[in-house]
């Protein structure tokens, strides 16, 4: 019997963003110091500073009481450039 421990390889953040771009995965982006707003859309470009270009972007208000997104009140933004400094989290919207 072997005592080898299985370890998972670390995935660099840039690779994760690149996968979202390649697969055209809808994403939700949480903003730094803007807990009442999230951005949904598709990543169509990014750079080494994690600035991202989002297409079909929608600004979604978040209820401060329960943290739920109010998608019906979303504001369409179209194509936007979001600076990496403003991004707290990027996750799949699926």
Curated annotation (Swiss-Prot):
Keywords: Cytoplasm, mRNA processing, mRNA splicing, Nucleus, Ribonucleoprotein, RNA-binding, Spliceosome. Residues 14-94 form the Sm domain. PROSITE patterns: SM. GO terms for cellular component: commitment complex; cytoplasm; nucleus; pICln-Sm protein complex; precatalytic spliceosome; spliceosomal complex; U1 snRNP; U2 snRNP. One of its GO terms (molecular function) is RNA binding. It is found in: Cytoplasm; Nucleus. Gene3D superfamilies: 2.30.30.100. Pfam families: LSM (PF01423). Coiled coil: none annotated. Disulfide bonds: none annotated. It comes from the Eukaryota. One of its GO terms (biological process) is spliceosomal snRNP assembly. PANTHER family: SMALL NUCLEAR RIBONUCLEOPROTEIN E. Involved in pre-mRNA splicing. Binds and is required for the stability of snRNA U1, U2, U4 and U5 which contain a highly conserved structural motif called the Sm binding site. Involved in cap modification. Present with 556 molecules/cell in log phase SD medium. Belongs to the snRNP Sm proteins family. Component of the Sm core complex, present in spliceosomal snRNP U1, U2, U4/U6 and U5. The core complex contains SMB1, SMD1, SMD2, SMD3, SME1, SMX3 and SMX2 (Sm proteins B, D1, D2, D3, E, F and G, respectively), and is probably a heptameric ring structure. SME1 specifically interacts with SMX2 and SMX3. Component of the U4/U6-U5 tri-snRNP complex composed of the U4, U6 and U5 snRNAs and at least PRP3, PRP4, PRP6, PRP8, PRP18, PRP31, PRP38, SNU13, SNU23, SNU66, SNU114, SPP381, SMB1, SMD1, SMD2, SMD3, SMX2, SMX3, LSM2, LSM3, LSM4, LSM5, LSM6, LSM7, LSM8, BRR2 and DIB1. This is Small nuclear ribonucleoprotein E. The gene is SME1.
């Amino acid at each position: 019997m072997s005592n080898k421990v299985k370890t998972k390889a670390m995935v660099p953040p840039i690779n994760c963003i690149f996968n979202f771009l390649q697969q055209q995965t809808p994403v939700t982006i949480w903003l730094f110091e803007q807990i009442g707003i999230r951005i949904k859309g598709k990543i169509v470009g990014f750079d080494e500073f994690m600035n991202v270009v989002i297409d079909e972007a929608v600004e979604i208000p978040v209820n401060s009481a329960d943290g739920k997104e109010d998608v019906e009140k979303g504001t369409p933004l179209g194509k936007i450039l979001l600076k990496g400094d403003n991004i707290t989290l990027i996750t799949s919207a699926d």
